[in-house]
């Protein structure tokens, strides 16, 4: 598998800036104008991409399949009720959304939930495919999407390590080596104790060289920011223009534009702070190096020719003289010059 590749011209993977996806899902509420607002505000918030979901209710769920989430606006409904309410955007609608994203300078793609959706998105020339956690073991769908030859983003919620390996192998079988694995806990919203960020490190060890990130279902920006500090190369966060909207059940648990902006800013701050694993004096520390450290200092006046004794010495700031770790080497030397009391001692003096 490749450790670095490109999505719509942007490098993604190991050693690259974290790729931030605003996961709009179906928060467009089947309203094209709202979909365009999602795109515009995501771009203004600093996200690298926006992602939607492409499905038809009848192709992914039976009419009686119970929900695994709570939906206040329809508490007794089934999965089919939700999906059927939110699957009304046509291929032409998606074409319009992708065109609008290109117009405002934001990468856009979608999660296909069936082979027909893959084909439609491929025809629309999306730059990547995302496979949802629940479909990682739907191997025919994974292979069908991977065969298109675009980068694959695989969420791993509910999956065993063996199932993740099988999904990677499915991509390899059809010649797709451009894959990102996203750690995920399939719970909406997910409390911090359920996130298990260290699983990202486990995925990195299990599949060396494969880029790893986080599909985040927590509230706020703390968890995804911490994920970047642990090495996440991609963050996906649910996104809405307004948490109070009805329609999609995801609005209330999604980041709004202010939160997305805060998340992107926090991630970029962490990236700058991570720096490099080389210990030494940083350029920003140069003044502190000179003036916050201490030097061997005369505790009394030391006339020229005097053999220096320990009681004649102390150590004080600044650090422009002999480092205190060499104090014992100064003891027993002869003063070459008159050294006034409270003087920073240099090697030229002794």
Give the residues covered by each predicted segment.
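Catalytic cores and adjacent flexible loops of soluble metabolic enzymes
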Residues: 1-350
């Amino acid at each position: 598998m490749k450790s670095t590749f490109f999505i719509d011209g942007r490098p993604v993977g190991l050693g690259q800036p974290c790729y931030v996806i605003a996961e709009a899902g179906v928060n467009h509420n089947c309203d094209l104008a709202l979909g365009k607002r999602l795109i515009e505000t995501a771009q203004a918030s600093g996200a690298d991409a926006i992602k939607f979901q492409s499905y038809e209710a009848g192709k992914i769920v039976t009419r009686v399949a119970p929900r695994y989430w709570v939906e206040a606006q329809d508490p007794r409904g089934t999965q089919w009720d939700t999906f059927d309410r939110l699957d009304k955007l046509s291929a032409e609608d998606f074409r319009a959304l992708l065109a609008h994203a290109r117009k405002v300078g934001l990468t856009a793609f979608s999660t296909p939930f069936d082979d027909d959706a893959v084909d439609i998105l491929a025809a629309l020339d999306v730059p990547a495919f995302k496979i949802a956690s629940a479909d990682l073991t739907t191997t025919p769908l994974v292979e069908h999407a991977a065969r298109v030859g675009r980068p694959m983003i695989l969420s791993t919620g509910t999956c065993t390590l063996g199932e993740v390996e099988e999904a990677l192998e499915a991509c390899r079988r059809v010649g797709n080596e451009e894959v990102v694995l996203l750690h995920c806990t399939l719970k909406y919203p997910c409390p911090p104790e359920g996130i298990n960020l260290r699983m990202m490190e486990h995925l990195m060890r299990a599949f060396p060289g494969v880029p790893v990130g986080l599909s985040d279902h927590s509230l706020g920006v703390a968890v995804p920011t911490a994920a970047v500090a642990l090495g996440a190369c991609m963050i996906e966060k649910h996104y809405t223009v307004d948490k109070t909207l009805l329609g999609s059940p995801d609005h209330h648990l999604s980041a709004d534009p202010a939160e997305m902006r805060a998340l992107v800013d926090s991630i970029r701050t962490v990236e700058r702070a991570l720096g490099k694993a080389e210990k030494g004096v940083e350029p920003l520390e140069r003044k502190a190096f000179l003036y916050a450290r201490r030097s061997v200092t005369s505790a009394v006046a030391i006339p020229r020719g005097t053999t220096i004794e320990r009681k004649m010495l102390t150590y004080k700031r600044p650090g422009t003289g002999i480092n205190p770790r060499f104090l014992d080497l100064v003891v027993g030397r002869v003063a070459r010059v008159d050294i006034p009391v409270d003087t920073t001692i240099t090697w030229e003096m002794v």
